[in-house]
């Protein structure tokens, strides 16, 4: 139960920060210049983005394949597994479309907004970002029903696959409709696209993302009240406990998995990681929103925002893997069995010995 609470709280905090970030992203995209100036830091930002996208695609692929193999070999699928698999697929497509925009340098052409390729990629990127908000909303709603024996919503605790797929279909249709509106706004020339119309369209795009955020907040409040009644108030975390928690992160892949690890310690580790993400997103939101309000056409500002915005899709699979004991222990077992430095040195010595013979 505590593992599901960690996943839900992780989705709730990062959902809100990403929602604020997307609002400023829409403003900057509406006022994006027709030709992007090659600043001295542009190549540096590209160099930082490629490893980020590669790492995020690899981590989400591992998470997606693990759930696929679990379904194939066990012939059973939980609702939470379907949602996490869908979220991983969305993040893969999100990072892939953003990588195409960076690699092909669509922003460097003079007729960017008239290019069909640019519109298609921007449309897919916008749809994936909207789906990355709707999917954690469903995840939080399912995890909020934590006491089926008391509440009348017990029948919603284990929804069927048809209900989950129906929600996915509705989310895809809704976000594709929003993406069409977004691309139609980009199609207008700058003369016809005034600041008032841009703000109205940006607020409309922000409004459809506000409803999932509100749902997540209500479910989080409900779950927090229930946990308070069951477990009582949480202990206050002191400085020494924070230091021990950080050390737990560093020693996660250097020590064998212990079956008696305290769930409270794992929860506090996830909270510390979430605090760092929230701080990063709030700094980026302040930076990007100030540029969107003042209508500053700074390409370096846009590319910095792209890197920070995609950090959600790149790092969130690590949080899901760490929150899932089964995946984490499997990866840890593979590490100690095949990839740990002592094992690699032993294999190297055996190969050297066989070569000498």
UniProtKB/Swiss-Prot annotation:
UniProt-recorded Gene Ontology molecular function terms: pheromone receptor activity
Extracellular membrane side: 1-3, 74-81, 152-163, 291-300
Domain of life: Eukaryota
Keywords: Cell membrane, G-protein coupled receptor, Glycoprotein, Membrane, Pheromone response, Receptor, Transducer, Transmembrane, Transmembrane helix
GO annotation terms (biological process): response to pheromone
Residue spans, topological domain Cytoplasmic: 25-52, 103-130, 185-269, 322-357
Sites carrying sugar chains: 297
Pfam family, one: V1R
Protein name according to UniProt: Vomeronasal type-1 receptor 5
The encoding gene: VN1R5
Natural source organism: Homo sapiens
Keyword Transmembrane helix: yes
Residues of the signal peptide: none
């Amino acid at each position: 139960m505590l593992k599901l609470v960690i996943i839900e709280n992780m989705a709730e905090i990062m959902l809100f920060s990403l929602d604020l970030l997307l609002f400023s992203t829409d403003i900057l995209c509406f006022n994006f210049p027709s030709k992007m100036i090659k600043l001295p830091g542009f190549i540096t930002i590209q160099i930082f983005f490629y490893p980020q996208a590669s790492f995020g695609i690899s981590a989400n692929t591992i998470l997606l394949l693990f759930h696929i193999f679990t379904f194939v070999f066990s012939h059973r699928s939980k609702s939470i597994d379907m949602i996490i698999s869908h979220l991983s697929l969305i993040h893969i497509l999100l990072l892939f479309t953003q990588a195409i925009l960076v690699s092909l340098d669509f922003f460097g052409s003079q007729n960017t907004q008239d290019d069909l390729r640019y519109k298609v990629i921007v449309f897919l990127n916008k749809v994936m970002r909207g789906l990355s908000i709707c999917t954690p909303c469903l995840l939080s709603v399912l995890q909020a029903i934590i006491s089926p024996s008391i509440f009348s919503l017990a029948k919603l605790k284990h929804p069927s696959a048809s209900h989950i797929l129906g929600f996915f279909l509705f989310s895809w249709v809704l976000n594709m409709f929003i993406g069409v509106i977004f691309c139609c706004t980009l199609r207008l020339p700058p003369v016809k696209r005034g600041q008032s119309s841009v703000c109205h369209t940006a607020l409309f795009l922000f409004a459809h993302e506000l409803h999932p955020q509100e749902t997540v907040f209500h479910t989080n409040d409900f779950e927090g009240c229930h946990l308070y009644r069951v477990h009582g108030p949480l202990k206050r975390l002191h400085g020494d406990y924070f230091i021990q928690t950080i050390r737990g992160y560093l020693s996660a892949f250097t020590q064998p998995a212990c079956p008696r690890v305290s769930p409270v310690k794992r929860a506090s580790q996830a909270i510390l990681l979430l605090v760092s993400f929230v701080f990063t997103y709030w700094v980026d939101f302040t930076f990007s929103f100030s540029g969107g309000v003042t209508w500053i056409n700074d390409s370096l500002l846009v590319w910095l925002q792209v890197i920070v915005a995609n950090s959600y899709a790149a790092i969130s699979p690590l949080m899901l893997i760490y929150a899932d004991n089964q995946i984490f222990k499997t990866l840890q077992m593979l590490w100690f069995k095949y990839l740990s430095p002592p094992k690699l040195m032993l294999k190297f010595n055996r190969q050297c010995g066989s070569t000498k013979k």
